[in-house]
């Protein structure tokens, strides 16, 4: 985004309101991790929400760095860890950046391990940078009271209309 475009007062008011909202259960996923269940937002959901909030051309993401932290080969298998820094910039120049991490263990292929770890690190960094803008972009997931309440809320059914 080369030119800065200021948000209108109406856009600022709407964004301030919307960014304070919490994610609905349809945007949350869970997986088992250290210490039990882990709640997260998938990468495509975070991008979808950013497009809805800021407009498809109202924000950009930039991969600022991608670093292979380690690569170990043993018995024909590969373990790799990668860290990434992503910056999210809004049309008015406001930005946040954060670090993400990705890894692959016990892979048969060095290429497959690197691909998975790099994509995972970049997506993790993107989601972590987006969450800094507000609750509706994932920051609410860090509120343990919120995530414990969401375990008991059913996801709404999806209705697809084809015209």
Q: What is each PLM-predicted segment?
A:
Residues 1-47:
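N-terminal, Lys/Arg- and Ser/Thr-rich interaction peptides
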Residues 3-13, 46, 53-161:
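Positively charged, aromatic-enriched nucleic acid-contacting surfaces
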